[in-house]
Amino acid sequence: MKKKILFVASEFASGMIPFAATAINALAKDDRFEVHCLCVNSGIYSYRNIILQEANPVFLEYPKSKMMKLFYKLWPLEIIKHLSQLEKSINPDAVHFLTGDFTLALYICLNNKRTFYYTVHDLHPHEVVRKTLLGYLMQKYIIWGYKLCRNIIPNLTTSSYFQLKELKEIYPCKKVKYTSFPSLITSLIINGKKMPLEVSGLKEYILFFGTVDKYKGVDLLVDAYCNLTCKSLKLVIAGRGFDIETHNENIIRINRFIEDEEVAYLFKKAKFIVYPYRSATMSGVLSLAYYFNKKVLASTIPFFEDNACLLYTSPSPRDGATS
């Protein structure tokens, strides 16, 4: 008898989509499981092209109006309706919330079951810059939702050994398991041949790739690069996020969503990759560098230290990044 697994992926950040899709597809190809999944798309951030049909996907669309987006974050009625229907029709042996899924915190609180599983991504919140009061309050609500989910759900998983130890100490009565971090490599990345126009004509460069947030230390990287006496390679910062005042013609800022089809070109042309994170529990960007066989300069945070083949530097002083 096959085990029936229902995966839920209600969040669609660029790194979250391949994380969830890889896990879903892996079990969908395993004869021991009957897999179903409920995934939420938002425009270009979509699961549609990477989830296998064997996973029996149900796709929902994130609302477009500001008012409906707010309602979605508080009580995502469409997700709850479809989730309830799937639970009744499938009668799954496990329901696994893969992507943080803070919008479902109240639903989980009211309907918690021993068959629920929850992937913990960041036990400790990242340092994030919010420019408005609404943004600040929403960030607090998101953090509260994550905490409520992991406090209530009886089965937790993580892809960080450092976090695994801490979770077991905090929740001694819960089942806490380690799962390997899924690769972010998708077929669109593997077969992609699209060249980002911003790097047209460049033969080699130093690359930072990923969403630009404060905790990722991109400002430290920029300062360190500007302090170099020899700038034989340009610095490319590729990924949507807060903008950085550089006033340096050798720094190329690609502040937009990077399509999967563009990733291969960016990595293949890079001399090496830099990840100067101040903090992070887990990060899938390493799988991209490994796949394209690129050297990585990374800060000494626990998740990076769990992985071999890295050159480490201090995550805080600018001198460390410069060296």
Where are these regions (language model features)?
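N-terminal strand-loop element at the rim of the active site
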Residues: 10-14, 26, 30-73, 103, ...
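An aromatic- and histidine-rich active-site surface loop
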Residues: 45, 79-80, 95-113, 118-120, ...
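Short N-terminal targeting/anchoring amphipathic segment
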Residues: 72-75, 83-104, 115-117, 155, ...
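Membrane-proximal helix-turn-helix segments that form the acceptor-binding/catalytic region
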Residues: 84, 136-156
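Conserved donor-binding/catalytic core segment of Leloir-type glycosyltransferases
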Residues: 198-216, 222-225
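Nucleotide-activated donor-binding/catalytic signature segment of Leloir-type glycosyltransferases, i.e.
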Residues: 244-264
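Acidic donor-binding loop of glycosyltransferase active sites
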Residues: 265-282, 291-294
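Conserved small/polar residues in nucleotide/adenosyl-binding loops
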Residues: 312-321
